């Protein structure tokens, strides 16, 4: 079986193209927009370290773009209770309309991406993806026990 490793890059590029008009309007770099949407869509992740580890964005880019989002009033930094070393990133009220518009773009992108794919095929894709994730977890688990 031959995998097309360009697939993930193509999704990323196409998604960025869909976000470009909003980013341009807001004068936000794509990375800043991605950080804002990541924090809004994944409330379990709250720190710059989370963004680096989960989104795989380089630390210096996270730092610069978080500063921009804070300075523009889209994010606030709040100290983490019981751990002075950590700072939690919180979306502000001002970010609400941006997040709402971003989610509409994401929903439309998903709709367009899955055009021509019926519910049964989506269900099968979900099952396949879950199995691939389980397989990767098992590979990681085995490697960590060596």
Specify the residue positions occupied by each region the protein language model found.
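Amphipathic, non-transmembrane alpha-helical scaffold segments
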Residues: 8-12, 16, 55, 99, ...
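Short, locally clustered residues in the helix-turn-helix/winged-helix DNA-binding domain
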Residues: 12, 37-43, 103, 130
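Charged, amphipathic alpha-helical coiled-coil/dimerization segments
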Residues: 68-126
